């Protein structure tokens, strides 16, 4: 008589799907207003990793627009013929739009406006509508360091790797 049951491969696939589902659920929760700096930066890093992986899968360019009180992930889309490009736009034929990723949060905000973005080469940070950090389809990104108030920040190098020590991005 033949035994019936699940194979090891089927069990591993179920565990993988449960893990991915749990991760998506956690990213979909709205930000609580009393987050600590470490929690806020961890949420930003999780969103950044999600967008980085999405870029690897889809081949799209993404960006992050950082303001003192919030951040927003953006996607580079082709302009349609009815949408003229502004005269000072360096993205001829393309425009940055807020990223919509289903139920996954692609933005965040904090009370009090304490976010600070620093670049490896010492470039000045001027918050605006265009992205401050570019995320390329291969996973590379603009090197940066993000801090929240006086707490230690997070830093990433040009390869998109998190730097272990909170130091100037390389």
Swiss-Prot record:
Record SUPFAM superfamilies: Pili subunits
What S-S linkages are listed for this chain?
none
Q: Is Protein transport one of the keywords UniProt gives this record?
A: yes
Which regions span the lipid bilayer? Answer: 6-29
GO CC, sorted alphabetically, is: plasma membrane; type II protein secretion system complex
**Which intervals of the chain form a coiled coil?**
none
Cellular location of this protein? Answer: Cell inner membrane
Question: According to Swiss-Prot or TrEMBL, what is its membrane topology?
Answer: Single-pass membrane protein
Organism superkingdom: Bacteria
Which stretches of the sequence are propeptide?
1-5
Q: How is it modified after translation?
A: Cleaved by prepilin peptidase.
| Modified sites of kind N-methylphenylalanine | 6
What InterPro entries would the database entry show?
Answer: N_methyl_site, Pilin-like, T2SS_protein-GspH, TypeII_GspH
Biological process terms in GO annotation:
protein secretion by the type II secretion system
Report the function annotation for this chain.
Component of the type II secretion system required for the energy-dependent secretion of extracellular factors such as proteases and toxins from the periplasm. Part of the pseudopilus tip complex that is critical for the recognition and binding of secretion substrates.
Quaternary context: Type II secretion is composed of four main components: the outer membrane complex, the inner membrane complex, the cytoplasmic secretion ATPase and the periplasm-spanning pseudopilus. Interacts with core component PulG.
Belongs to which family? Belongs to the GSP H family.
| Protein's name in the database | Type II secretion system protein H
Species, as recorded? Klebsiella pneumoniae
Supply the gene name.
pulH
